[in-house]
Amino acid sequence: MVSSYPLPDGFSEFDVFSLGSCLLVEGLLGILLNAVTIISFFKIRELRTPSNFLVVSLAMADIGISMNATVAGFSSFLRYWPYGSDGCQLHGFQGFTTALASIHFVAAIAWDRYHQYCTRTKLQWSSAITLAIFVWLFCAMWSAFPLIGWGEYDYEPLRTCCTLDYSKGDRNYTSYLIPMSIFNMGIQIFVVMSSYQSIAQKFKKTGNPRFNPNIPLKTLLLCWGPYGIMSFYAVFENATLVSPKLRMIAPILAKTAPTIDAFLYALGNENYRGGIWQFLTGEKIEVPQIENKSK
């Protein structure tokens, strides 16, 4: 029974229920929205383009994050992690792989949009597929290192989900965190920032903005910035001295990424939105196309 398991340190009954409910809602909503994004891609022929393949690849990564959140939400209602140490390692690996992949695909979409709007060149299928394969393998590689001793997976403060352990802040953790962050966050932030800055300048010249180029970077930093701050804080200070409730803000915000991405890159994309509408209702909507040229 739930009552037989003690509350995690620093959390009340209400805290555990509220955080568990947030994780469960985030997980189920993310699964629903990204499942619609993925199914629409395969059902509607007009959506099956190389650029949209990056969007559906992002949705696949995000649905993985949402599944991770759903498991964490369910465990929160139990008040404990029911899957043992091996389950914790698997949960950490799966969550970290999909999180890194999500960040990479956000950067890939920014890079593709830069070429669409600024250089008027079209992404080819071979490039899109190669890029997606590289992203998944690269992210899986970095996520596998903690399984073999470089870095470590352990419980979040709520002790009902697992992630990269920042509580120790030792040399092993620091030596892993710095290169991992550079190759899986720093470069991606630079790509997103520079790509959308160029797009914003292009929109300003043409006077025909197709979307708000300031939003993608802001949402990326909103979702993943708190994790980055806490991770680097642990390099210099004892992160366990920070309130457990405050430390749980990072995973809660991170798991909003799948829902935000679905609205931003699928429902917020007039071409993709039209395909989703056609899938759901059978009604086809004609949208203006970007004039591209192949390399």
Each language-model region and where it sits:
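Class A (rhodopsin-like) GPCR signature focused on the TM5-ICL3 interface and adjacent 7TM helical core
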Residues: 105-117, 146-157, 178-234, 264-266
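Seventh transmembrane helix
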Residues: 222-231, 248-291
